[in-house]
UniProtKB/Swiss-Prot annotation:
Family as reported in the entry's similarity comment: Belongs to the UPF0398 family.
PANTHER family: UPF0398 PROTEIN SPR0331 (PTHR38440:SF1), UPF0398 PROTEIN YPSA (PTHR38440)
Record NCBIfam families: PRK13660.1 (NF010181)
Record protein name field: UPF0398 protein LSEI_1479
Species whose genome carries this gene: Lacticaseibacillus paracasei (strain ATCC 334 / BCRC 17002 / CCUG 31169 / CIP 107868 / KCTC 3260 / NRRL B-441)
Length: 191
């Protein structure tokens, strides 16, 4: 049981070489996220809490929004570290962030100031781990990325209290891709 509030984070899009919504890797990632979230929802998950980073965090929001018709009580929160989060992004990415923030049930900045110092990022991570019951990361320690810091923070919280940390690793993604390919092959054989 992951509890009622789940923090979802992981790799940035560029770390996975996913560039665009039609990338086949994205379908695998979203399928894996969907399957895991549905399992947690069936166990009593109420809130998905994530940030707005380009990559797993935004994809998790997209997947969660797609699950809301099946789980009408499911809530989504997008918390960003500071008020001007994403301002350095190109116009399309800023628009995507704004659109997602407009669709979730709750969105706010942890620090009510523009970016000033790295301590705001540490404060954000501390806030998220304190206000969630478990973490789900699309992350593999054998393939480090920026989510390494989130993984370390989640593991540190797990050392202090009951805080399950579940990873979707590269092997898990490979298994999902194989299952999807097998299902597609069966579909074509039955036609």
């Amino acid at each position: 049981m992951v509890g009622k509030r789940l923090w979802v984070t992981g790799y940035r899009a560029y770390e996975l070489n996913v560039f665009g919504s039609n990338d086949p890797k994205l379908k695998v990632l979203k399928t894996s996220l969907k399957n895991t979230l549905m399992q947690f929802l069936d166990e009593g998950l109420e809130w998905l809490i994530t940030g707005g980073q380009l990559g797993v965090e935004q994809w998790a929001v997209e997947v969660a929004l797609g699950l809301k018709p099946l789980y009408p009580d499911f809530k989504i929160a997008m918390m960003v570290p500071f008020t001007d989060f994403g301002k350095q992004w190109n116009e399309d990415n800023q628009g995507q962030l704004a659109a997602l923030r407009g669709q979730v049930d709750f969105s706010d900045a942890v620090s009510q100031a523009p970016y000033q110092q790295p301590a705001q990022l540490q404060g954000y991570t501390r806030f998220i781990t304190i206000h969630t019951d478990a973490a789900l990361l699309v992350y593999d320690p054998e393939f480090p990325g920026k989510a390494k810091w989130d993984y370390q923070a989640a593991e540190a919280m797990a050392d202090r209290r009951d805080y399950p940390v579940q990873l979707i690793t590269m092997d898990d993604l490979e298994e999902t891709a194989q299952a999807m390919a097998e299902a597609e092959n069966e579909h074509f054989q039955n036609d």
